[in-house]
Regions:
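Catalytic Walker B motif of ABC-type/P-loop ATPase nucleotide-binding domains
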Residues: 199-203
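Conserved catalytic motifs of ABC-family nucleotide-binding domains
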Residues: 195
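Conserved ABC ATPase "signature" region
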Residues: 46-47, 141, 145, 152-170
């Protein structure tokens, strides 16, 4: 078994006792303990005629255990078909687990589904779920009534949530005239009407342009997670969302939990810490000597700007080792303008975790 796979097993074993990103005691907002789910495999008429009693099933979640602390911004990563959507549906009480338990705010998703729905709200990032011919206020008033609210409480809560998402000035504007970013905010407002403690976000910025997406991420971080104190579970493929928002992430593949932690710690566990050196001496023998001695990995020169070259290298050992490399190069007379860690691209991080897990399984 690989080192990463071993750490994953240990993380799963201790997830329930220590979910906090800092390793300290924390209350749990969401706890999954050995959750598994499979669905029937669709078969052709010919296959059913030949084997009428066969009932094949495809696993979608396989023994997933993790815990999310209250107030945490937690990311779910993985390729399409990894099980993220099924996991969200299970937390929202729309899908029942085959085995294992899941709790939200201390309530079991099977035995206490109504209480779970009172503390959790999924945010459907589909603008078509809004009533475009109604105003923002009318959309929220309708939803509030569906949530069981009555009388003056409706108007008060609608006013509050519109202020939270920054749409107070456009509350009488029909939704059809809203920009995509405004519609996303209205979807958040709709979820906040019932005052949930946990929000489920599924790729909330996928329909936004880069500038609108950046503003929306700021809104999620500062207002929803910061001032409102909501626990947020985010399923995403966006590196910007992960880096700007998530305290920790979990990587899923084919329904299996492969790793949890910060993106930095996961990259370090993979031995894939990469650094960039900006120097005028890209061909200095001291750099080649570091490679020969096995202190750094292969060097890659990435362009030249005004006489300064960017030299990338793999380097294990974290910041302490990096400082030693800088000191050694300085002693050898290498001119250094900047030395910095290069974050591993999110797609590469996920791909390498998946490949490492597959290699560990084949060697087990």
């Amino acid at each position: 078994m690989s080192g990463l796979a071993a750490r994953d097993d240990a993380s799963a074993a201790h997830a329930l006792s220590d979910p906090s990103p800092a390793g300290g005691a924390a209350r749990h907002a969401v706890v999954l303990d050995g959750i598994s789910k499979s669905f029937p495999v669709r078969r052709t008429w010919g296959e059913m005629a030949r084997q009428p009693t066969l009932r094949p099933r495809a696993p979608v979640l396989q023994n997933v255990s993790l815990a999310v602390a209250e107030g945490e911004f937690f990311g779910l990563l993985g390729p399409n078909g990894a099980g993220k959507t099924t996991l969200f549906k299970m937390l929202a009480t729309l899908v029942l687990p085959d085995s294992g338990t899941a709790t939200v705010g201390g309530y079991d998703v099977v035995g206490e589904a109504s209480k779970v729905r009172s503390v959790l709200a999924p945010v459907i990032a589909d603008e078509r779920s809004l009533y475009w011919r109604l105003t923002a206020s009318q959309n929220l008033e309708l939803f509030a009534k569906l949530q069981g609210m009555r009388g003056a409480a409706i108007g008060k809560r609608v006013t509050e949530v519109l202020a939270i998402v920054g749409l107070s000035d456009t509350k009488e504007k029909i939704v059809a005239a809203f920009s995509s970013g405004m519609k996303q905010r209205l979807l958040i407002a709709r979820a906040l009407v019932a005052q949930p403690r946990v929000l489920l976000l599924d790729e909330p910025t996928r329909s936004l342009d880069p500038i609108s997406a950046r503003g929306f991420r700021t809104f999620l971080r500062d207002e929803i997670s910061g001032r409102q104190g909501c626990t947020v579970l985010l399923a995403t493929h966006s590196a910007d969302e992960v880096l700007e928002l998530c305290t920790r992430v979990a990587v899923l593949d084919h329904g299996r939990l492969l790793a949890t932690g910060t993106t930095t710690s996961l990259a370090r566990d993979l031995g894939e810490e990469r650094y960039a050196l900006y120097t005028r001496d890209a061909n200095h023998p001291a750099l080649a000597a570091l490679v020969q001695r096995g202190i750094v990995g292969a060097l890659a020169v990435r362009g030249d700007e005004d006489g300064w070259s960017r030299v990338e290298m793999e380097l294990a050992g974290g910041m302490e080792r990096a400082s030693q490399v800088v000191a050694m190069l300085g002693e050898q007379g290498v001119v250094i303008a900047r030395f910095e860690r290069v974050p591993l691209p999110l797609a590469d991080l996920i791909d390498r975790i998946v490949r490492r897990s597959a290699e560990g399984s084949s060697n087990a």
